[in-house]
Amino acid sequence: MKANELREKSVEQLNEQLLELLRDQFNLRMQKATGQLGQSHLLSQVKRDIARVKTVLNQQAGK
């Protein structure tokens, strides 16, 4: 996911995307805790995506 793609979305779409990413992060953390997570890079990838969405939301709120 790129920041340019996120800037084209509305605030409602970004909030939905953020909720989905937070759910994904929670599920990945639970899988890691139980030893079921085989692809550990997904955790950091989702964390970065959450940061991107929050950054774009803050930029749009400042306009």
Swiss-Prot record:
Disulphides: none
What Gene Ontology terms for biological process does this UniProt record contain?
Answer: translation
Question: From the UniProt record, which GO molecular function terms apply?
Answer: structural constituent of ribosome
Q: Which organism is it from?
A: Stutzerimonas stutzeri (strain A1501)
The domain of life is Bacteria
- Name the UniProt record assigns to this protein: Large ribosomal subunit protein uL29
Q: Sorted alphabetically, which PROSITE patterns does this protein's record hold?
A: RIBOSOMAL_L29 (PS00579)
Q: For this UniProt entry, what's an example GO CC term?
A: cytosolic large ribosomal subunit
List the keywords (alphabetical): Ribonucleoprotein, Ribosomal protein
Database matches in Pfam families: Ribosomal_L29
User: What family does this belong to?
Assistant: Belongs to the universal ribosomal protein uL29 family.
Where would one find coiled-coil regions in this protein? none
Q: Which InterPro entries match?
A: Ribosomal_protein_uL29, Ribosomal_uL29, Ribosomal_uL29_CS, Ribosomal_uL29_sf
